[in-house]
Design a protein with these regions (language model features):
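Short, well-ordered alpha-helix to beta-strand connector turns
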Residues: 5, 27, 208, 226-228, ...
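Dinucleotide-binding Rossmann-like beta1-alpha1 core, especially the glycine-rich loop
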Residues: 49-124
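C-terminal catalytic lobe of FAD-dependent flavoproteins
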Residues: 317-374
Length: 374
C-alpha cells in the first residue's frame, strides 16, 4: 500500500521549512507537523500592538554566506538593522563589542595606541601563561578591568557557575576592536525580516499542509504510516525515548511585558554584566525595526523581555546544548542509533544537538536537500 505523503516533516522551524520548500519545488508531497501552536520554531515572532516580539529570544540574522543570503531573501525583505548592544554595569554604560568607546569609558584613553598599551599592561600584570579556567583565559586576553566589569557577572549568570569553575575553552577569543565600530557581527549581510520571522517562515511553508499542536512522538506509529520518509527536527534523545539518558541543555526564561511608554531603554539589547542584577539582558523588541510598525508609523507603546538563564531540567524548553565531553559522548551514541534509522533524517539544532546560528541551519538544511532530493 502506498503512503499518502513522500515526506513527513516534524518541526516547522527554519530547518524544516527549508526542506519543505525544496521538497515542494521538487514535486514531492509533504505534511508538516509541530507540537507548538505556532510555526517558525524558536524564530517565532508574534504581533503585540504592532511590535514583532521575538518570543523565544532575540534573533538577528547575519551571514557571510552569499548563497544563504540569496536564498532566504526570496521569502522576506530584510531591513538594515545592525546589532550594537550596550552593557550596563551598575549603571555605567559600555559599548559592546569591546571597542574604542568601551576603552575610553573604562580608562579615559583616546587613541588606539593608548588602548592597546593599556590592555597589554593589564595582561602583563596578570602574568598568566597557561590559563586553567575561563577567568584566567579572559584576563589573559583582555586584562582584569574588562573581565571584572563586562565578562565575569554576565558569564556566571549565563552558566550558573563561577568563572574559576568553567573551562578555558568556552572563550576561545575575545574580539578587541581598536576602532569605533559598534557593529557586533562582522557579517557581510545582516538584518531582520520586515514583517517578522513568522511571516517569512509562512512564505517558506506556503502551499503545504501544516498541522499544529501535534506531538509526533505521542502518535509516532500513526504518523510514520502516512509518509515514506521522516525529516525529524526534534530532540534526538527524545526520539529514542531517552534510552541512553538525557542530553543536557541550558535554558532561558523570559519575562515579557507591554509598557505604556514609547521608549524604555533606547536600544534593542542591553546586557546586565554585574552579578547582582538577576537577569542577563533586556530586549526592547521595537528597536529591531527602528521603533516603527509595518506601515512605517511610530509605535506609541513598547514591549520588553527580561532574560534569565536557568538550569535545564527534563520538560523545560531546550535552548543551548551543553557541549562538554560527557554530553558529546552521549550524543555520539544517539547518533549511532540515528544512523540505523534508514527512513529518518535527523536535522537542526535539536536533531543534531548543535548550537546553530540561523544561517548555518539554513546551509545545513540546503546541503541535506541536495543529498535527499538530488
Amino acid at each position: 500500500m502506498s503512503k499518502k505523503y513522500d515526506y513527513l516533516v516534524v518541526g516547522a522551524g527554519l530547518y524544516g521549512a527549508v526542506f519543505v520548500h525544496e521538497a515542494k519545488e521538487a514535486g514531492k508531497s509533504v505534511l508538516v507537523i509541530d507540537k507548538r501552536p505556532n510555526i517558525a520554531g524558536n524564530v517565532f515572532t508574534e504581533d503585540v500592538e504592532g511590535i514583532h516580539v521575538h518570543k523565544y529570544g532575540a534573533h538577528i540574522f547575519h551571514t557571510n554566506n552569499k548563497k544563504v543570503w540569496n536564498y532566504i531573501t526570496r521569502f522576506a525583505e530584510f531591513n538594515r538593522f545592525t546589532n550594537s548592544p550596550v552593557a550596563n554595569y551598575h549603571g555605567e554604560l559600555y559599548s559592546l563589542p569591546f571597542n574604542m568607546y568601551t576603552f575610553n569609558k573604562m580608562w579615559g584613553v583616546v587613541t588606539p595606541e593608548e588602548a592597546a598599551a593599556k590592555i597589554e599592561e593589564q595582561k602583563k600584570e596578570a602574568g598568566i601563561a597557561e590559563p586553567k579556567n575561563l577567568e584566567e583565559q579572559a584576563i589573559s586576553l583582555v586584562g582584569r578591568d574588562i573581565f571584572e566589569k563586562l565578562i565575569k557577572g554576565y558569564t556566571e549568570k549565563q552558566w550558573g557557575r563561577d568563572c574559576k569553575d568553567l573551562p578555558a575553552f568556552i572563550i576561545k577569543r575575545l574580539p578587541v576592536r581598536l576602532t569605533f565600530d559598534n557593529n557586533y557581527f562582522n557579517a557581510l549581510y545582516q538584518g531582520i525580516p520586515v514583517g517578522g520571522y513568522t511571516k517569512m517562515v509562512a512564505n517558506m511553508l506556503d502551499g503545504v499542509e501544516v498541522r499544529l499542536g501535534e506531538d509526533y512522538l505521542e502518535k509516532k506509529a500513526e504518523y510514520d504510516a502516512l509518509a515514506e520518509k521522516v525529516i525529524y527536527t526534534g530532540p534526538i534523545d527524545a526520539y529514542f525515548d531517552y534510552q541512553m539518558g538525557y542530553l543536557e541543555y541550558r535554558s532561558v526564561r523570559f519575562e515579557t511585558e507591554l509598557l505604556d511608554k514609547s521608549n524604555f531603554q533606547g536600544n534593542a539589547a542591553v546586557n546586565y554584566t554585574d552579578r547582582e542584577t538577576p537577569w542577563t539582558r533586556i530586549i526592547e523588541h521595537k528597536w529591531f525595526e527602528f521603533g516603527k510598525d509595518d506601515e512605517g508609523n511610530d509605535l506609541p507603546k513598547t514591549v520588553i523581555s527580561r532574560e534569565y538563564s536557568s538550569e535545564w531540567k527534563p520538560g523545560d524548553e531546550p535552548y543551548y546544548p551543553v557541549n562538554d565531553e560527557k554530553n558529546g559522548a552521549l550524543y555520539s551514541k544517539y547518533r549511532e542509533l540515528a544512523q540505523k534509522e534508514k527512513k529518518v533524517v535527523f536535522g537542526g539544532r535539536l536533531g543534531e544537538y548543535k548550537y546553530y546560528d540561523m544561517d548555518a541551519v539554513i546551509a545545513s538544511a540546503l546541503d541535506m536537500c541536495e543529498k535527499e532530493l538530488g
